[in-house]
């Protein structure tokens, strides 16, 4: 039986909030079977918990925010992507502010931290959401589409008419597995345009943004001295974002995902469209690990 996963032990770290610019503590704690992914605001008294649920998502500026009444946890997509990449089902994430720390702008640091906690199998079957028929979400010329597929394939295309974005590197496809995610996707950093930064900071946004946690792009190209980690790092990061956004449905999805200029809002709308009709999907488990179309890292 393919089993649910959590961590063996608590892992603690800290980083800078992308928008606040303040230090944020983040702790990863084991969670119970079928507990799902839960964010806990420990800076509040009493602490407030918010389930990682697509129906609680509100988009802020270029990030996904979980909102429960007047409490939010923002910039969750990179840590959610790492959790999905390792196949973790149940986890409590404590944060000391209203946003998850940005780390280096990728999911790589979160992969490292989670592995320090050691993956632990639980005595319950791992659940998957299998898409049974095509579902789409459209906004203007942007689109996000699920079609039935034996596995989890992500095809993504961005469209930037800019010297930094070579045409041949604006599309990418991956067949999702832990190995592919860790080595080919998790290190791809978020990116932004330098011309937007002054405006954002004037509006108390992106106060923590720097070339240590993002790829900066000016009128001619990439500003970072080290350049890109991958020739197609921009589109790989959009895949990273999509993996995190789509994991907010509560379980790993079995389907093909096609995104064209899709962002957090459209990815979330796609999940809502799936959930609007129960005939769009079914919950499946695998008694034999060999029958699972998605390969995860082995748990010792």
UniProtKB/Swiss-Prot annotation:
Functional note:
Catalyzes the hydrolysis of UDP-3-O-myristoyl-N-acetylglucosamine to form UDP-3-O-myristoylglucosamine and acetate, the committed step in lipid A biosynthesis.
Task: Name the chain's protein.
Answer: UDP-3-O-acyl-N-acetylglucosamine deacetylase
Give the record's pathway. Glycolipid biosynthesis; lipid IV(A) biosynthesis; lipid IV(A) from (3R)-3-hydroxytetradecanoyl-[acyl-carrier-protein] and UDP-N-acetyl-alpha-D-glucosamine: step 2/6
The answer to keyword Cytoplasm applying to this record is no
Which cofactors, if any, are listed as required? Zn(2+)
NCBIfam families referenced in this protein's UniProt entry, alphabetically: lpxC
Do you know which HAMAP family this protein is assigned to?
LpxC
Q: Which residues form the active site?
A: 264
Q: Which SUPFAM superfamilies match?
A: Ribosomal protein S5 domain 2-like
For this protein, the record's Pfam families field holds: LpxC (PF03331)
The protein's superkingdom reads: Bacteria
GO MF entries: metal ion binding; UDP-3-O-acyl-N-acetylglucosamine deacetylase activity
**Gene Ontology cellular component?**
membrane
Family statement: Belongs to the LpxC family.
Q: What class of enzyme is it?
A: hydrolase
The alphabetized UniProt keywords are: Hydrolase, Lipid A biosynthesis, Lipid biosynthesis, Lipid metabolism, Metal-binding, Zinc
Identify the Gene3D superfamilies for this entry. lpxc deacetylase, domain 1, lpxc deacetylase, domain 2
């Amino acid at each position: 039986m393919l089993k649910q996963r959590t961590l063996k032990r608590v892992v603690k770290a800290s980083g800078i909030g992308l928008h606040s610019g303040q230090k944020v503590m983040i702790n990863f704690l084991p969670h119970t079977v079928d507990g799902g992914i839960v964010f806990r605001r420990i800076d509040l008294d009493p602490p407030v918990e918010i389930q990682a649920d697509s129906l609680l998502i509100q988009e802020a500026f270029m990030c996904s925010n979980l909102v429960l009444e007047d409490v939010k946890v923002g910039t969750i997509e990179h840590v959610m992507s790492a959790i999905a990449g390792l196949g973790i089902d149940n986890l409590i994430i404590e944060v000391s502010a209203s946003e998850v720390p940005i780390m280096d702008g990728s999911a790589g640091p979160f992969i490292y931290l989670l592995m320090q906690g050691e993956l632990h199998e639980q005595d319950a079957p791992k659940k998957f959401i299998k898409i049974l028929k095509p579902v789409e979400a459209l906004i203007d010329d942007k689109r996000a589409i699920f079609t039935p597929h034996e596995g989890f394939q992500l095809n993504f295309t961005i469209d930037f008419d800019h010297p930094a974005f070579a045409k041949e590197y604006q599309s990418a496809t991956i067949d999702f597995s832990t190995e592919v995610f860790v080595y080919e996707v998790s290190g791809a950093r978020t990116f932004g345009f330098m011309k937007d930064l002054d405006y954002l900071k004037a509006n108390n946004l992106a106060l923590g943004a720097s070339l240590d946690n993002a790829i900066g792009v000016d009128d001619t190209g990439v500003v970072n001295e080290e350049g890109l980690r991958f020739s197609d790092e921009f589109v790989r990061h959009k895949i990273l974002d999509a993996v995190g956004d789509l994991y907010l449905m509560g379980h790993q999805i079995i389907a093909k995902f096609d995104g064209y200029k899709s962002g957090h809002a459209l990815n979330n709308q796609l999940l809502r469209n799936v959930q609007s009709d129960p005939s769009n999907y079914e919950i499946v488990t695998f008694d034999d690990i060999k029958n699972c179309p998605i390969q995860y890292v082995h748990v010792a």
